[in-house]
Amino acid sequence: MSTDTLVKRPTRSELIDRFHSKIRAGEPIIGGGAGTGLSAKSEEAGDIDLIVIYNSGRYRMAGRGSLAGLLAYGNANQIVVDMASEVLPVVKHTPVLAGVNGTDPFVVMPTFLRELKEIGFAGVQNFPTVGLIDGLFRQNLEETGMSYAQEVAMIAEAHNLDLLTTPYVFGPDDAVAMAKAGADILVCHMGLTTGGAIGAQSGKTMEDCVALINQCIKAAREIRDDIIILCHGGPIANPEDARFILGACPGCHGFYGASSMERLPTEEAIKSQTLAFKAIRRKPA
């Protein structure tokens, strides 16, 4: 048996204590999505606090838009299980969470969550999520048994299994529901990340985000004052954006990046490096 397999992973309560210690010290909690083992390894090298893997990570690092994760291009829950063997062995000490499709009608959720814990995941997040869907389509999903309430139930079940839970919320009502379900960290989702080659071109303004995040914070704190709040998505795409939000939302404890943590940096770095090589000039023959 290798030394790595003997490493004791921190418990949920130990992780929460760690995060609260950082908050008291004025340090932001920074989480990130990883669509490849290299992304996860690099994020850990940057001292990230938590890593989440889910189907959209694989899609975006394959050059497809993140919303591909909401469409029928693959089994989201099986993709996460497949990604585990790529990511978990190369992450040495950072908690890795699984994105779970809570509305999957082909999964016995308590059994699946126990399997994820046994594989080595420290916790879960609700992704893919119907929270990103609106209009009549969302209404019909809710009416036909594929609802956000099922995602809340999944988070509650994960909490009962002592898994760390970091669900996406999209408004105050979601924040209340997830806080009541026992969620440890709420991630206020501001929509698809804008910018880059395959990012959204339209979305909320920063001012819109400030108002909505503060509403979510207020609603969640009325249920539990110990809950941790992070921001994610929309126009919050780089460190300066996150700094602005944390300054304008004192109750927000940090940032969770997905496209902003692996896609945008990769796009920029590879393009820049390629252009630098292309700029080399040699004497004509």
Swiss-Prot record:
Keywords of this entry: Plasmid
Domain of life, per lineage: Bacteria
GO molecular function: catalytic activity
InterPro entries: Aldolase_TIM, Pyrv/PenolPyrv_kinase-like_dom, TIM-br_IGPS-like, Tobamovirus_resist_UPF0261
Key word Lipid metabolism present: no
Keyword Acyltransferase: no
SUPFAM superfamilies reported for this sequence: Phosphoenolpyruvate/pyruvate domain
PANTHER family: UPF0261 DOMAIN PROTEIN (AFU_ORTHOLOGUE AFUA_1G10120)
Name under which the protein is recorded: Uncharacterized protein y4oV
Species name: Sinorhizobium fredii (strain NBRC 101917 / NGR234)
